[in-house]
Design a protein with these regions (language model features):
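N-terminal [4Fe-4S]-dependent radical SAM core
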Residues: 1-37, 82-84, 330, 335-345
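Accessory C-terminal segments flanking Radical SAM cores
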Residues: 2, 219-345
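Canonical Radical SAM [4Fe-4S] cluster-binding loop centered on the CxxxCxxC motif
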Residues: 23-70, 303
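Glycine-rich short-loop/terminal segments
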Residues: 43, 52, 74-78, 262
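Short catalytic/ligand-binding loop motif for oxyanion handling, primarily in non-cytosolic enzymes
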Residues: 47, 57-60, 98-100, 131-132, ...
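Radical SAM/AdoMet-radical enzyme domain recognition
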Residues: 72-77, 81-90, 99-202, 208
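Active-site beta-strand/loop signature of hydrolases that rely on acidic residues for catalysis
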Residues: 93-94
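Classical nucleotidyltransferase
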Residues: 153-273
């Protein structure tokens, strides 16, 4: 393994993307894992300049606790009918930690662990809550087979080394308690060097960093990057398992070539940086092995806006089998990692 942990030992540019016939999260492929990506509300205590307008509000719009409990039960019932009894619940917002019952929700999931093959939880957060909140969180998180956090680093709010270190200390606390951490940094090209320096600040403290390309508000191609910038985004900051002593590079997604050979990337976001996210007319397990909940509406995925499965109030129906993808591309990594394969296979 390279002593320089900033760069990947694995050359992602060698992957023959035009010859790939199937891909997916390793856990979803190998462990029959059902994936739930749930936006608990759009309320956020931040208002970042580059945040998409639809992604946040200053009005508190949290999903009621009883609705959350009933939804969890119904998801598990339908998923089990399809043969899935391992679950990954990814909770986000807005800012999910300001949901008044966030810790109650993950306690509810923890109370049913013994009735599942396993349960994992994930949180996407700006981690602005005080460290006291995280001390409560880790006591619940340790009950799960796996708990993880994507911590969104926003330069407009973490504008001093003191604030950055306070942010890091919360994450190091969680990592010391077995929670897998990655810090998500949207690489605005106008501040690229500054943001790369901030990424190194955390990376040097043995915290994973995801350097994420910036997209315009309605999706589409990346904003303008130089070749050097794009190379850094595509190859920098490999994800490592810092909860293990050997810090091995962690590979999340498995890809299969048409000759049967296997390729790997450490995170689905890496595929998007290479522009490998157009799976229209492929068979996709979105809606069958995973769903997206936006406030009170249930969707097949984030990108499949036209394919509604129902609502939390009136009921929803998960697909009984994989279906053809009808969307031009997967705009976020949550969609990209869902297992899928070419129709001709």
């Amino acid at each position: 393994m390279s002593q320089d942990l900033t760069w990947s030992d694995y050359d992602y540019s060698r992957i023959p993307f035009n010859e790939i016939i199937s891909l997916g999260s390793k856990s979803m492929i190998n462990d029959s894992l059902f994936n739930v990506s749930w936006i608990l509300g759009r309320y956020c205590n931040y208002a970042c300049s580059y945040c998409w307008p639809h992604a946040h509000t200053n009005s508190k719009d949290h999903t009621p606790l009883e609705v959350c409990y009933n939804t969890i039960d119904e998801i598990k019932r339908q998923a089990r009918e399809n043969g899935f009894n391992s679950f990954f619940f990814s909770l986000s917002g807005g800012e999910p930690t300001f949901h008044p019952h966030y810790l109650d929700i993950i306690k509810y999931l923890a109370n049913d662990i013994e009735n599942t093959n396993y349960t994992a939880v994930h949180m996407t957060s700006n981690c602005s809550r005080k460290i006291k909140w995280f001390k409560e969180y880790v006591e619940i998180a340790k009950l799960f087979r796996r708990a993880s956090i994507t911590a969104s680093m926003h330069r407009e709010y973490l504008d001093t080394n003191e604030k950055m270190q306070e942010f890091a200390d919360k994450l190091l606390l969680c990592q010391d308690h077995g929670v897998n951490i990655t810090i998500n940094i949207v690489m605005d090209p106008e501040y690229f060097d500054e943001l790369w320096s901030k990424a190194m600040f955390f990376h040097e403290q043995r915290l994973n960093v995801t350097v994420k390309p910036m997209r315009p508000p309605l999706g589409g191609t990346f904003v303008n990057y130089t070749e050097e910038m794009l190379w850094k985004i595509q190859n920098g900051m490999p994800q490592r398992n810092y909860t293990l002593d050997n810090n091995t590079q962690h590979f999340q997604v498995e890809l299969t070539n048409k000759d049967g050979s296997k390729w790997y990337v450490d995170q689905a976001e890496r595929l998007n940086t290479f522009g490998f996210n157009n799976f229209k007319n492929w068979y996709c397990n979105a809606g069958y092995q995973g769903i997206v909940i936006k406030k009170d509406k249930v969707h097949r995925s984030y990108g499949c806006k036209e394919q509604h499965l129902g609502t939390l109030q009136d009921g929803f129906e998960i697909f009984k089998n994989p279906k053809i993808c009808v969307t031009k591309n997967c705009v976020i990594s949550t969609d990209t990692k869902i297992p899928k394969h070419k129709v001709s296979v």
